[in-house]
Structures are given as C-alpha cells and as structure tokens.
Amino acid sequence: MPAVQMTGVGGAVPAQVLTNYHLSELVTTSDEWIASRTGIRSRRILAPGQSLTQLAARAATDALSQAGRSPLDVDLLILATSTPDDLFGGAAHLQHEIGAVRAVAFDLTAACSGFVFALATASQFVRTGTYRTVLVVGADALSRYTDWTDRATCVLFGDGAGAALLEAGEVEGILGFELRTDGARAGHLNIHCTAEAVPLAADMAATRARFASITMNGREVYRFAVEAVPDLIEKTLAACGVAPEQVKAYLLHQANQRILDSVASRLHVAPERMASNLADYGNTSSASVPLILQEWVQDGRIRAGDRVVLAGFGAGLSWGVLLARWGRL
C-alpha cells in the first residue's frame, strides 16, 4: 500500500484590496473596532469580470510548479468550494483551465472545513492505489454572498485560493486525520437558498431559486470553535502518538484571531507556532489553510519533514484535523 506525501503547495489572491477604512465608509465601524475583535485589517476581493476558476488555476499551477509536476501528471482533481462559478460544479472548469486533461475532477463542499476534508479524501485515493497524483484546491469568493450593510459579517470575509499536491511515495506524510459534522447546529452559519414561485398552470407552480447573503450566529460559532477544535486536535495528536510540542506549525482556518489565540492557549502552544495571516486576507473559507501553508513553506518556516497540523472548521457545523509531515520524504 503506497504512502501519501504532500509535495507542493500554492496560493493566489485577487489584486483588489478592501481595507477596514473602506468598510468604515459603508457601515458604522472603524479599523480599530474590526482589528481588535477579529485581527483583520484588510481582505482581497474579486473584481467584476474575474472568476473563481481563474484564481483557483493560479494556485493550482503554483502548487504543481513547486512539486516539479505538470497538469498532465494529475490523476484526480478535487475542488473544495462553496462558491463555484457554475452550480453544477467548478472542478471540471478548473481541470480545463489548467490543462489537466487526464484527471478525474469533482467538487467537495464542506465550507471552511473543505480543504481539510478534501485532503483527507484525496489521501485515501492515493493510499488505496486508485490514483497516484492528486491535486487538492480550496477556493472561495464569499464576497459574492456578503451583505455589505451587515456590520457583523461584512468585515470578516475575503476571497482566495490555495492548492496542495498529494503523491504516492515510500515514506508516509499523512500521519492521521479526524473529521466531524454536527448538523444539529447547521443553522448557526448559512447561505440560504430562497425560492420564488413560478406559475406553470392554474394549479401548478415551480420555483426559481437564488442564494441569499451570509448569515451567522457569531457567538455560537465562536463557542463551537474554541471548544471543538482544540479537543479534536488533541485527539488526532494522541491517536498518532505525537505531543503538541512536536508539531512545528499549527495551520488553522483563519476565522478570527481570538479563536486562534484561544486554541493556542488551550494546547499550550507558543504563539509563534500558531500561524496567522488574518490581518491581510481575512476569512477566505476553504482557501485559508492552504494559503497560510503556502506562506510558511515559501518563507522557510516549514521545511521537509516538519510535522504540521491542518485544521478547518465552519458551516455544517463541520470541523476536521489532519496531521502531516510536509514535503517529499
């Protein structure tokens, strides 16, 4: 049975920068108010005419280049997204955009947990020998579903894309994972589908659907995150026989700096090992974990063989933790 290694990572964000000062002109808020409560100073937003597929393609190409692979090497492509350009799915469009013509492609939707869920899924395809080279992409454009008059949510979200390449190898790089879902709390974070009646006959109608803006019970989501995430990290590490201090970096979904600080405190992790890029990008949903991984690999803070914890959490409610050793081993 082949081992699984994470051999490349890439990231991409739009050029358009939306700062807290811009938002203070839209709603009653300030840079200090937003930053002190979230850690966010700015976020990147897709401009009109720009597609999520194009953004995801940049991240995917970056990951392949770092791993020394071409799109023709990819056997399977998984796109983790909640905001595809096409409701039928974005993965096929991405496959075409990057020229991965030999790859099977499908979407996986698990909101802000999506990238971790997709990595875990991809690892099983490699481990069973079904596929040898799997490209996992997390990309979202939550700006498309943001109510820019809602101060509670419009300050949080940005757009972005990140990607990682998994390959079969001799030495195991995916050490373990745990995934969870609690549908009883699904109502705490949503983009609801609303429907308008379309008359078809005297006694018959269909519906025309559209998606509303993001709604969130911030207090409940925060409570869930600071309790469930560190607990699952501890369970994952224990199952793998790894102590928290043996992990080089904790790469969590970038939702709120207070959540990151709380998890670090609970795990007794030094602040410098709890990665954060919230100040620059905000909450990019399924893109946040690969984006922060790409940053830390690029600047040398993560090197081949280092243990890293990847953790996603969000709508569903869903949460997942994956322990890996980075790089070609």
UniProtKB/Swiss-Prot annotation:
Keyword Lipoprotein (UniProt): no
Pathway per the UniProt entry: Lipid metabolism; fatty acid biosynthesis
NCBIfam families: fabH, PRK09352.1
Catalytic residues as annotated in Swiss-Prot or TrEMBL: 112, 253, 283
Protein name, per record: Beta-ketoacyl-[acyl-carrier-protein] synthase III
Listed GO MF terms: 3-oxoacyl-[acyl-carrier-protein] synthase activity; beta-ketoacyl-acyl-carrier-protein synthase III activity
Highest taxon listed in the record's lineage: Bacteria
